[in-house]
């Protein structure tokens, strides 16, 4: 039976791999345009990504083959997409995360946080979500996720180990109590129900899925709260200044924060509830605050186990201090580079006109390089006090990180995954697929503004699953601005929801770097992300719609068509 099932699975994978390109050929044959050829490649990649018939990283390389072959892009245009600024930001962040993991700083932080928060999974998840979202407000979503995931991984391992020990202890005590009248002297029999064990394993897997998804989701959600928190927000600000120069300061750091921060909190709470219901519903009663005495005793034992593990780490070591310094330096430099509400250190010497010479990627690579330089041991400058053995060792101790460790620990396949997403976005732009999609929106002129907003938000949320969110907003916002002006509605009534919908990339690993980072840890399948992310997309779209139509109307005066929009010529 198992062999037959394996054969069917293999045949299914082979059939999808072979017949998907063949079945989609009419798209290229019947529509002899470049945008149709681009759509052909995107559909194939989407199917392969969703079904995992070949490795995700290999699917990401398809544009390098198919775009030049189908004359969508030449080879040089495609290949350059695989090592862009965002890829370097991602790589630098992961190298820092590897250093944190190597010296077990994440374990120390994880145990300390776990001791403070407790072992209730629901409380842990909510804490992770708000911390990650807060970080994403000020630093890049990619960096926040790359820094939080090792901590999440360590906390989960410690929590599962502690709870397993507690359950085994309580189970043994309960068994002894039930059998104390019939137990033979010096003997003890323990019976394990395989169904119970299977259920516990499934609950553990679900907890891993929920905890990892909550981090990448909250990173994407948290970035929406500030103008500089994520790329689409910055694109919106730039498009407003370019398309509507008379709008002056209608959209600034303070006004955006006042609108977007409450929406972020609402989305985080809804996301937490959805993840709890989907993956941890069996634990809802166990994790309730008002639980019984038995649960409180369990938590006491778990706390004792965790505290013992924490004590084993000893005091903060020299390499841990250096890694902590590098991590703190990274966060401070990211935050202070260009905070938005005040001039950052970037403006002192590295901005010339519209050219910005230093990005977050520069900072990430700088700190990553430091990790290969800063020593992991204290250098001894007093040669007279050194022993004979110490004199034989090199003067400068080994660095915090060496290339062998970095090469083994960094998930290089995810770099290709991100590059594939950028190549797809470039193909859409160059082939005219984005213009074709805009032409399909002409009938929306006859629809009510609220319905237009919902439809366009869904369109953007769908598009951003396959292309970068920055590219999506860059392509769509000028079109939406022109449409809003032509039908006489406030441009921000359409542009704000669509900008925020570009951050609702919850369904695919390639959709956004936080998803890719989480996916790299191996606890999730593409199907898991699609199942969870589909509802998250609807939750996000409806939350943004509610925000725009309540306090957003009052803040931006969305009920009235502004003079600055009427007097501006918008060119798409």
From Swiss-Prot:
Quaternary structure and partners: Homodimer.
pH dependence of function: Optimum pH is 7.0 for citrate.
Sequence similarity: Belongs to the SLC13A/DASS transporter (TC 2.A.47) family. NADC subfamily.
The species this protein was found in: Mus musculus
Keyword Membrane: yes
Activity regulation description: Inhibited by Li(+).
Designated name of the protein: Na(+)/citrate cotransporter
Role played: High-affinity sodium/citrate cotransporter that mediates citrate entry into cells, which is a critical participant of biochemical pathways. May function in various metabolic processes in which citrate has a critical role such as energy production (Krebs cycle), fatty acid synthesis, cholesterol synthesis, glycolysis, and gluconeogenesis. Transports citrate into the cell in a Na(+)-dependent manner, recognizing the trivalent form of citrate (physiological pH) rather than the divalent form.
Carbohydrate attachment residues: 382, 566
Disruption phenotype: Mice show increased propensity for epileptic seizures, proepileptogenic neuronal excitability changes in the hippocampus, and significant citrate level alterations in the CSF and brain tissue. Null mice show perturbations in fatty acids, bile acids, and energy metabolites in liver, serum, and brain.
GO molecular function per UniProt: citrate transmembrane transporter activity; organic acid:sodium symporter activity; succinate transmembrane transporter activity; tricarboxylic acid transmembrane transporter activity
Subcellular locations according to the entry: Cell membrane
């Amino acid at each position: 039976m198992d062999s037959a099932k394996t054969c069917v699975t293999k045949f299914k994978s082979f059939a999808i791999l072979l017949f998907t390109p063949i079945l989609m050929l009419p798209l290229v044959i019947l529509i002899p345009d470049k945008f149709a050829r681009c759509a052909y490649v995107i559909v194939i990649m989407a199917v392969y990504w969703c079904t995992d018939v070949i490795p995700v990283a290999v699917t990401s390389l398809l544009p390098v083959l198919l775009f030049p072959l189908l004359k969508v892009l030449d080879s040089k245009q495609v290949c350059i997409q695989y090592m862009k600024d965002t890829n370097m930001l991602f790589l630098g962040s992961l190298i820092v995360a590897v250093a944190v993991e190597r010296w077990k700083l994440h374990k120390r932080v994880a145990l300390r946080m776990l001791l403070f928060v407790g072992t209730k999974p629901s409380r842990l998840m909510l804490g992770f979500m708000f911390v990650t979202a807060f970080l994403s407000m000020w630093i890049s979503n990619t960096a926040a996720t790359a820094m939080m995931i090792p901590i999440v991984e360590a906390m989960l391992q410690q929590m599962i180990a502690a709870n397993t020990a507690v359950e085994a202890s309580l189970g043994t005590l309960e068994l002894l109590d039930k059998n104390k009248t019939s137990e033979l002297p010096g003997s003890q029999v323990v019976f394990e129900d395989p169904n119970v064990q299977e259920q516990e394993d499934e609950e553990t897997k679900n907890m891993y899925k929920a905890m990892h998804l909550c981090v990448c989701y909250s990173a994407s959600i948290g970035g929406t709260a500030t103008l500089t928190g994520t790329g689409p927000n910055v694109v919106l600000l730039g498009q407003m200044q370019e398309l509507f120069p008379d709008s002056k300061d209608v959209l600034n750091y303070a006004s955006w924060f006042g609108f977007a921060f409450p929406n972020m909190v609402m989305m985080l709470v809804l996301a937490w509830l959805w993840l709890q219901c989907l993956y941890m519903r069996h634990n809802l009663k166990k994790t309730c605050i008002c639980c019984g005495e038995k649960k409180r005793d369990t938590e006491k034992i778990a706390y004792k186990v965790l505290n013992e593990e924490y004590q084993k780490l000893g005091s903060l070591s020299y390499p841990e201090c250096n890694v902590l310094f590098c991590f703190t330096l990274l966060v401070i430099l990211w935050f202070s580079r260009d905070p938005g509400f005040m001039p950052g250190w970037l403006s002192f010497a590295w901005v010339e006109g519209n050219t910005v010479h230093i990005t977050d990627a520069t900072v990430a690579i700088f700190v990553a390089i430091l990790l290969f330089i800063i020593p992991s041991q204290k250098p001894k400058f007093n040669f007279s006090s050194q022993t004979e053995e110490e004199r034989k060792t090199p003067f400068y101790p080994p660095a915090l990180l060496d290339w062998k460790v970095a090469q083994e620990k960094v998930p290089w396949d995810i770099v290709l995954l991100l590059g594939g997403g950028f190549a797809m976005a470039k193909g859409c732009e160059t082939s005219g697929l984005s213009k074709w999609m805009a032409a399909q929106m002409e009938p929306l002129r006859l629809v009510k503004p609220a319905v237009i907003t919902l439809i366009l938000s869904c369109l953007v949320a769908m598009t951003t699953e396959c292309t970068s969110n920055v590219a999506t907003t860059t392509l769509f916002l000028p079109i939406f601005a022109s449409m809003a002006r032509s039908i006489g509605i406030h441009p921000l009534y359409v542009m704000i929801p669509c900008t925020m919908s570009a951050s609702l990339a919850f369904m695919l690993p390639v959709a956004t770097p936080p998803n890719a980072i989480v996916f790299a840890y191996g606890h999730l399948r593409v199907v898991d992300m699609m199942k969870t992310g589909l509802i998250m997309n609807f939750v996000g779209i409806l939350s943004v719609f509610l925000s725009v139509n309540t306090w957003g109307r009052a803040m931006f005066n969305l009920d009235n068509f502004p003079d600055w929009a009427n007097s501006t010529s918008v060119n798409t």
